[in-house]
Design a protein with these regions (language model features):
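Acidic, Ser/Thr- and proline-rich intrinsically disordered linker/docking segments
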Residues: 1-37, 71-75
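Short, mixed-charge low-complexity intrinsically disordered segments
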Residues: 38, 42-75
Length: 75
């Protein structure tokens, strides 16, 4: 299980989701990183879903993300 954790501007607590496949997490990571680099000039909404907690959904305005990280969650 892989976790993707994002930190938001003016928020002391990170948001995280879990995915089973590294490729899924890496794709989301790269998408968020592109938004952070300013490659997309429009205000975008990033929608994330978690595979560990079935009904966990997160929506974030992309320009508010200040950091993103991936790590493997060991059991």
């Amino acid at each position: 299980m892989y976790s993707l954790e994002i930190s938001l501007r003016y928020s002391p607590f990170p948001l995280s989701i879990q995915k089973k496949d590294y490729e899924d997490v890496k794709r989301i990571y790269n998408e968020i990183k592109d938004f952070m680099q300013g490659n997309n000039q429009n205000t975008h909404l990033i929608e994330l879903s978690c595979e560990k907690v079935q009904d966990k959904l997160i929506a974030v305005v992309a320009k508010e993300v200040i950091s993103v990280q991936i790590y493997e969650k060991s059991a």
